[in-house]
Amino acid sequence: MATRSTIMDTNSFRPEMAAALDPETRKLTEERDVLGPAYRLFYRNPVHLVKGRGSHLWDADGEEYLDVYNNVASVGHCHPRVVDALTQQASMLNTHTRYLHENILHYAEDILSTMPDELDRIMFQCTGSEANDLAIRVAQTYTGGEGVIVTSEAYHGNSALTSKLSPALGTAQTLGLTMRMIPTPDTYRLVIDGKPAAECAAEEFGNWMAGEVRKAVADMERHGIKFAALLADSIFSSDGVYPDPVGYLKPVID
């Protein structure tokens, strides 16, 4: 069994750190008691953010930060086109998919035009947790299997299903019995057949990862578990964000 990840634990603020904080920051951290324990606060000295524009953030003291972390605002904070579109739609109509509406159809068509022909349907979800949850359930229904493979530092969501597939949540989270972990495709540290992974061609690196997947599938089969899916984001963001060679996932998929 692979070692459980503690990435989230390592980055988290803990109550015993409060004594070193200024009074205002300490007060805000104490007031977070109204939030559930799954809400994590980062850093020994938590950042109190009040404004964002583009790739920059500002805290309550006016200190400016370059945001190279946040995964929420993928087109930049407060992008004027996004703000304008949200404002216009919120001022006109906010409802669900049980009624006819052109916008959802046009949006779906735009997205599908960028996808392979095999992906010809869309089911919109509100969060990544829900999207991954649905993807796994689709894979399990299609294959008739239950087994899911993830990388050793992966985070895939907070739902009942995806949290059991997220080693990055740390030791407080029980992992699924039908889940298997493979090593993170770390081009900085891995050595493959005596050669640093960073020097490997895409096919060579992909063959290594495909071998790790095959070993995980074989272990599932030894325990009577049928393989259903490999769940991964292509940059392995929770694992560390690795610049792996373009096309390396093809041998894994094949």
Regions found by a protein language model. Name each.
Residues 36-40, 68-80, 235-239:
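Glycine-rich phosphate/pyrophosphate-binding beta-alpha loops
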Residues 59-60:
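Short, acidic, Ser/Thr-enriched surface-loop or helix-capping motifs
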Residues 74-76, 95-96, 189-192, 238-242:
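A generic structural signal for short coil/turn motifs at secondary-structure boundaries
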Residues 109-229, 246-247:
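PLP-dependent aspartate aminotransferase-fold enzymes
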